[in-house]
């Protein structure tokens, strides 16, 4: 349960991810999508949170080794060089540059030297190319230009072959192109989406 | 992850606290070099604890709430990071005071 003052944001959140699949999570602004992810990852204190992989509970003090999370806002320290961040995450910077050639000139740049969209792609590459069985991406397409959205979608599809990925975004078209199954979060609860009617019923679409 | 990486990450995470802590540690060390008494140590650590708590409170008001996930993704929880900063800060005070005691002993 996630509560801010008297307002209950999330009371019954539940989501699953399978290796080889991309799960999309949809929901209106303030529905509790990011709160759920923050709670799962230990960035928000909440009651009764449980994360398990293959039915075994995950040690939440070390959850980052099993699940890598791209938050909605910036997570990299502003003064850290991109090459240093990639080194700490065990990712070869040049394998990222192969996918996003523009970044060859940012090898020694700190995050503050990049624009919002450039920083977003760098953080996304850092998270998705680091090793973990599962990834959670919170609004990965925000601030990114259309050409890079296609490259990001391709990277998500590629990594989903042998990893489980959960994605949430307000760009419904972008998410529907990569997601194998969808959930919607509304009124504090998550529900699976089987058809467009489910999204209308939960107030996400008209 | 190497110890060097861990210290670097602790510095990145708690830079403000560590800089404020270091300034206080240097002030304590200079006071100590002028005159030593048992109560000085107790007072120095009590004041340090109070300053640490106030700094932490102020930092939490303005901190980027998503920055913690950079460390969580590396398997380091918020609690571990806070403890590392606390340990490094108090360790630097202990080392500085010991050094002053040895030099001016």
Positions of predicted regions on the chain:
Chain A
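Conserved beta-strand-loop-alpha-helix hinge in the C-terminal portion
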Residues: 189-206
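Conserved ABC transporter NBD signature motif
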Residues: 46-65
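The feature captures the beta-strand-to-loop junction immediately N-terminal to the Walker
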Residues: 26-28
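Q-loop/switch helix immediately C-terminal to the Walker
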Residues: 69, 73, 78-93
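Helix-to-loop junction immediately C-terminal to a conserved catalytic motif
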Residues: 41
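Walker B catalytic motif
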Residues: 139-140
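Conserved ABC ATPase signature
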Residues: 110-114, 118
